[in-house]
Curated annotation (Swiss-Prot):
Binding site for dCTP: 117-122, 128, 132, 135, 143-145, 163, 177, 184, 188
Protein's recorded name: dCTP deaminase, dUMP-forming
Family: Belongs to the dCTP deaminase family.
Documented activity regulation: Inhibited by dTTP.
UniProt gene name: dcd
Cofactor(s) for this UniProt protein: Mg(2+)
Superkingdom per UniProt: Archaea
Subunit relationships: Homotrimer. Two trimers assemble into a hexamer by stacking on top of each other.
Amino acid sequence: MILSDKDIIDYVTSKRIIIKPFNKDFVGPCSYDVTLGDEFIIYDDEVYDLSKELNYKRIKIKNSILVCPLNYNLTEEKINYFKEKYNVDYVVEGGVLGTTNEYIELPNDISAQYQGRSSLGRVFLTSHQTAGWIDAGFKGKITLEIVAFDKPVILYKNQRIGQLIFSKLLSPADVGYSERKTSKYAYQKSVMPSLIHLDNHKKD
């Protein structure tokens, strides 16, 4: 069962679902809009070796970031051109990880799905690749996987970036996500890189 606008407000008011900050204007008919934070991660590795910890750098914007498509062949000259013409804080190429401003806590009988906004999809920008599912019992901010597929796109801090759809489980989970010892992304307070190297890889 998907929660309606009335259900979402009721769950938040009764603190069964925590959304901080919460804006009643962001409640849709059966979703809640979330906004883009100011911290991002860019990977430094030539190859993603998923058995090892990945190298990355964190960046923080004051206002905006320009995301160029994959294999855009970005040069220093082009970066300086974009910064001067469009007054952006950073220019990046390829995938970049972002985060929501919103911190959420879900009870063990509510799961959620993150979906990018249709308006961003219409300029061929995605804000999640495969990680749209949020397990019951999750606590933390949502890490976003941002990729532009056509032209460079300027994103602004605090703009609406996507929405959460909440579903009620038939019965509560015995162990919620943030209670599991194997959960790698519980209580994340900002953007987090992939921690897949912590998985138990079976070697033949």
